[in-house]
UniProtKB/Swiss-Prot annotation:
Processing and modification events after translation: The tyrosine sulfation is critical for the function of the peptide.
Gene name tied to this protein: GLV8
Protein name listed in UniProt: Protein GOLVEN 8
Signal sequence annotation: 1-32
Knockout consequences: Shorter and fewer root hairs.
Gene Ontology MF annotations: growth factor activity
Modified residues (Hydroxyproline): 107
Organism: Arabidopsis thaliana
Propeptide residues according to the Swiss-Prot or TrEMBL record: 33-96
GO annotation terms (biological process): regulation of asymmetric cell division; regulation of lateral root development; regulation of root meristem growth; regulation of root morphogenesis; root hair cell development; root hair initiation
Annotated Gene Ontology cellular component terms: extracellular region
Upper classification of the organism: Eukaryota, Viridiplantae, Streptophyta, Embryophyta, Tracheophyta
Length: 111
């Protein structure tokens, strides 16, 4: 085999490996959805049961309803419904416990 053909073969092989790595790296990030997840705080009983909320009725008007056709509050993923939105709602544990900024106590003066 000539030197120039060996160099072309090695370059082509390395380019193929590089492109394969790039394609595999970006393949895992796309799951066919729009990657917009709504973070909602729910009770610890539901978290311990491992349930994911599928549909949630907002408590304030500033929140956008995920599924406006739903009449009762919310429905879990293990309950069957024909009008469920396919967008999953993930639990945000910190939102449930957050009560605003905590006041800082004044530093003690050592005289």
């Amino acid at each position: 085999m000539k030197k120039w053909s060996y160099a072309k073969l090695m370059t082509s092989a390395l380019l193929l490996v590089f492109l394969s790595i790039i394609l595999l790296a970006f393949h895992g990030g796309s799951r066919g959805d729009n990657h917009l997840y709504d973070h909602v705080a729910i009770g610890t009983k539901d978290i311990l049961m491992g349930r994911k909320l599928k549909d949630l009725k907002p408590k304030t008007e500033s929140l956008k309803m995920i599924n406006p056709k739903k009449k009762n509050g919310f429905e879990y993923s293990d309950q069957v419904s024909s009008d469920l939105s396919r967008q999953e709602v993930f639990v945000d544990m910190m939102a449930r416990d957050y009560q605003g900024p905590k006041p800082r106590s004044k530093p003690l003066k050592n005289n």
